[in-house]
Amino acid sequence: MATGVLEEWCGAPVTVEVRHRADGRLLIPSAERTCGRGSTQAEAQAEGDAFLPPERVAELMWLSPGARVQFRTVHLRAGTDKVVTASAVVALDRISPEERSVLSTTDTPLGRALAAGGGVRRVMVASSEPTRLEPAVRPPGDTGAPVLIVTALLCRGTVPIGLVRETFLRSLLDRDAVHDA
């Protein structure tokens, strides 16, 4: 998936660094409850990364409230450069025990971990957001500035098994690798 494309673009192996991983339940706050610090919504978001609200995750992935999920936040690196940050929600009851084990114990990229259980494809982009690099906000050499944010649904057949939000960083565009058009 994204890792293979990045390796081709960068002309170098891409490594994954899992920054946060937690198995839990998709908890959807009731309408009358407000979500503050320590609320159940915090459990439905990957650490330090803006993700979709839990009710939107449930809608896109066809999940019931309380569904077993894994929340993941990773950095993808080409050499020492961080080129992408990604957050994901994976429906644990829709993947094999072997896939759950790989996701819980290794830094294997999400696409590769899920591909072992049968074809996974990106069937829908929930959103794609180009990002302007504002010089007043970002210093000229800020390689960590986002340039594109993509939110995609991962499916096996017609069944959603994951939702991933990838933030492509300026460092990806600043790489010296030669790219074919």
Predicted segments, located by residue:
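Composition-driven recognition of glycine/serine/threonine/acidic- and proline-rich low-complexity segments
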Residues: 1-181
